[in-house]
Amino acid sequence: MGSTDEPGSSMHGVTGREQSYAFSVDGSEPTNTKKKYNLPVDAEDKATVFKLFSFAKPHMRTFHLSWISFSTCFVSTFAAAPLIPIIRENLNLTKHDIGNAGVASVSGSIFSRLVMGAVCDLLGPRYGCAFLVMLSAPTVFSMSFVSDAAGFITVRFMIGFCLATFVSCQYWMSTMFNSQIIGLVNGTAAGWGNMGGGITQLLMPIVYEIIRRCGSTAFTAWRIAFFVPGWLHIIMGILVLTLGQDLPGGNRAAMEKAGEVAKDKFGKILWYAVTNYRTWIFVLLYGYSMGVELSTDNVIAEYFFDRFHLKLHTAGIIAACFGMANFFARPAGGWASDIAAKRFGMRGRLWTLWIIQTSGGLFCVWLGRANTLVTAVVSMVLFSLGAQAACGATFAIVPFVSRRALGIISGLTGAGGNFGSGLTQLVFFSTSRFTTEEGLTWMGVMIVACTLPVTLIHFPQWGSMFFPPSNDSVDATEHYYVGEYSKEEQQIGMHLKSKLFADGAKTEGGSSVHKGNATNNA
């Protein structure tokens, strides 16, 4: 026998007893066998309380991974906006080029959000979020190498695909938290994610200035600055993939193999999403809440820079206030919806949405008409509160439209936000027909007009803004959600998760229904 030190003589890897190291994408909790959670849960294992500063797995860990990854995507998508005064000089961009780039930045995710909805329904939100964040990283790095308007517009379009992480964010929260607190949770996750639009207004000018002071020229400094959001993408993608999990009980693939989760068909999911008229109303509503927020992120820094002759850093700070308001505005919208639902049920949620979004539109008109810096800043802050709170109030209702097709409906609604933004940017901010202040004024008018269809949303079990329920609230709630499954599908138990959701959603009838049920049970 040869020496044990001889190359090839080691038995390492043969006995299977040696310590080994590997990278896994299966997540931290592949499945769950009747485990206890750190938070109180309902029959679906969804958390019934929201502890903001907790990192308990899986619920709160998922919350933090979700909003941080979404915020990272917002930072990169709008990283160019606060640097436009420098970039336009370097690339010789015209107002038309800048407007088209703004449209491109939010148009890319119209398609990707639709795809993300299906990915969440069929594969789970963890894979969808992690892979999209990491696949977007090369496009962020590519911004450093653009040399003309065409390249600038193309790269902004490609980076915009990553905004589809919004869909995985909202879907993920809806699978982890109880319906009675979903408005607050969805609003906080999305609001803190959207806050990236404000963070980037502060971050990118500071990074640019640091690089310039280190010896780089202005036209080189802005290019190097894009490496910061690019690396953030890679880091967050790895964290989501390794630390996240799809459902409270584990990852979707593992639970499907164990028979704990039914594998659905894409055709059925798509059918129930597109044939529900409420879906399309929310697409429109979100187009003029989130959509106008995205449009404003693209123009607000340049607006203050040009109109009031401010320094780039000062304009960036003011513009950051618009995005940073998401820290509390969007959660407040979801929280207000939850509070209204406790007393007035779904009808309270609908009234809350209409009041908040209409108010935001009126403040937007005021912003466009403002003649002084102080007035413009005040009206911008109030407009941001209204628009962002309306986003929170919208996604406090979306999870109730359909249980089976939640992912695709979330994707369609999210895509509506991007489509509305692209259309608004194209009509009001991409040509010389309107000045920026005129564009803001007409955008406010459109917000008010496009919020009116909320009056048409009617749930048979809960009613609408002006009409009461058309069926008994308790029995109709189960029928509404379980009715999305055929008798054959119900026989094999595909409807059971929806039935559990319906049991929890019966509280959307309002306090009068609770009292009625208590009386009957007595």
Swiss-Prot record:
Function recorded in the entry: Involved in high-affinity nitrate transport.
GO MF assignments: nitrate transmembrane transporter activity
Membrane topology field: Multi-pass membrane protein
GO cellular component: membrane
PANTHER family per the UniProt record, alphabetical: HIGH-AFFINITY NITRATE TRANSPORTER 2.3
Signal peptide positions (record): none
Tissue specificity annotation: Expressed in roots and shoots.
Phenotype upon loss of function: No visible phenotype.
Up-regulation conditions: Transient up-regulation at transcript level by nitrate. No induction by growth on low nitrate concentration.
Protein keywords: Membrane, Nitrate assimilation, Transmembrane, Transmembrane helix
Family: Belongs to the major facilitator superfamily. Nitrate/nitrite porter (TC 2.A.1.8) family.
Gene it is expressed from: NRT2.2
Source organism: Arabidopsis thaliana
Pfam families named in the record: MFS_1
Transmembrane segments: 67-87, 103-123, 127-147, 149-169, 191-211, 224-244, 269-288, 308-328, 350-370, 381-401, 408-428, 439-459
SUPFAM superfamilies per UniProt: MFS general substrate transporter
Protein name as catalogued: High-affinity nitrate transporter 2.2
